[in-house]
C-alpha cells in the first residue's frame, strides 16, 4: 500500500518501459514485475521519449487469475482492498473470510507475481537475495507473536514489514496459527486467557 500521491506504474507505462499485466503489476520485458520504480520530478518541460511498448504481452495466459487467493484478478473493477497483500498490511478489522484467506501469510502476497512467466528467470536468479539473511529460513509464528518492540525493530526494521508496525505482524501471525489450528495456538490461548486484557495486543483481541 503506497502512501505517496504519485502512481509510478502509470508514469512507467506512459514512458513505454512496460505494461500493466493482468495481475495489475507493471511488467517490464526482460525484467518482469519484481522491480522498484523511482520518479525524478523536474520543474522544466521536457519532450518524452517514444514509447517502447504500446500493448500488453500477457496474451491468453491466466496463471495469475487462477492462482490469486482472493479470486479478484480478471474481474472489473479490480477490488484492491480484497487483495491478500492489502489485508496483511491493513489495520482495519478483518472478516472471518478475510482471516481465512490469509492462510499462513503474515505480510504481503506475491502469488500473482510468482506464477507469472515473465518473472521466471528473476525468481530463479535474484528473489532470494532480496530478503535479509535472518528471514530466508522463514518466520516462526509463535516467536513473532511474542516479540518485544525492540526485538521487532531488530529483526524487521530493514524489511517492508518494518514500517507497518509490530501489532499488524503479530495479528497476522496469530491468524496464521489459528488457520492451521497449530497446537501452539491453543497453548498460547490458554496461557493468555486468564489475563488477556493485559497480555494480548489490542489488535488481536477481536479475533480470540
PLM feature spans:
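Catalytic cores of enzyme domains
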Residues: 1-135
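Alpha-helical scaffold domains
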Residues: 86, 94-208
Amino acid at each position: 500500500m503506497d502512501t505517496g500521491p504519485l502512481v509510478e506504474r502509470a508514469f512507467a507505462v506512459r514512458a513505454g518501459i512496460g505494461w500493466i499485466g493482468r495481475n495489475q503489476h507493471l511488467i517490464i520485458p526482460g525484467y518482469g514485475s519484481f522491480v522498484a520504480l523511482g520518479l525524478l520530478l523536474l520543474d522544466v518541460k521536457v519532450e518524452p521519449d517514444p514509447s517502447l511498448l504500446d500493448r500488453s504481452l500477457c496474451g491468453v495466459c491466466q496463471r495469475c487469475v487462477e492462482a490469486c487467493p482472493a479470486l479478484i484478478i480478471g474481474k472489473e473493477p479490480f477490488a484492491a482492498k480484497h487483495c491478500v497483500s492489502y489485508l496483511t498490511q491493513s489495520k482495519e478489522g478483518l472478516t472471518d473470510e478475510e482471516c481465512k484467506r490469509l492462510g499462513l501469510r503474515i505480510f504481503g502476497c506475491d502469488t500473482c507475481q510468482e506464477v507469472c512467466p515473465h518473472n521466471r528467470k528473476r525468481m530463479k536468479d535474484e528473489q532470494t537475495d532480496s530478503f535479509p539473511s535472518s528471514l530466508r529460513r522463514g518466520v516462526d509464528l509463535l516467536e513473532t507473536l511474542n516479540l518485544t518492540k525492540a526485538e521487532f525493530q531488530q529483526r524487521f526494521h530493514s524489511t517492508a514489514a518494518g514500517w507497518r508496525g509490530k501489532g499488524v505482524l503479530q495479528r497476522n501471525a496469530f491468524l496464521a496459527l489459528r488457520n492451521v489450528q497449530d497446537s501452539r495456538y491453543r497453548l498460547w490461548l490458554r496461557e493468555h486467557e486468564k489475563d488477556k486484557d493485559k497480555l494480548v495486543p489490542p489488535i488481536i483481541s477481536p479475533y480470540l
